Amino acid sequence: NADGGDWLDAYTRQEDGFKAGDLLTVGGDNYLLVQRDHRENGVYSRFNAVRCNQTITLGKWVKSTEPNDFGEYLNIFTPYATTPAYMVTQLTGLNKTVIGSVLGGTVAVIMPAYPIDVNVPVKCHYIDSTMEFVEREFTVESMDCTDVNTDAEGNIGGILRLQIKLSP
């Protein structure tokens, strides 16, 4: 049920057990369930959902255990999670075509919750205006964990909101 742009209302059967932070695939697009509407009728749940417009990879830099040909121990990007996410620049609003070309400022990210620290490297993958596959690296500046939760088994769930900045 679309209400414009990248956002829509998603209705799920209550017995399906969907919750904020879950991903749904509809017609080849990934949608992130962001917020549950508590006006339910006992049969279905209604969520605000956003169409994911990027795939991001979370990782960490690890110093190589072996020197290169010049005797240097290089830092190697080691990914630990790849997920669909919704990214928006503060300058472009919902215009997702400009996200990859941000040269300054910050980018807001809404994504499923993962263990993450400030300053963790985030790689964004997209196809630019010339139809080339591009990867850019960002660094997490701040995060909002208000809607992140942990269940009895220690599994992290919910929605994580980040502010990221293009790495130098």
Task: Locate each region found by the language model.
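Short, conserved turn/kink motifs that form compact alpha/beta structural patches or helix kinks used as
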Residues: 1-168
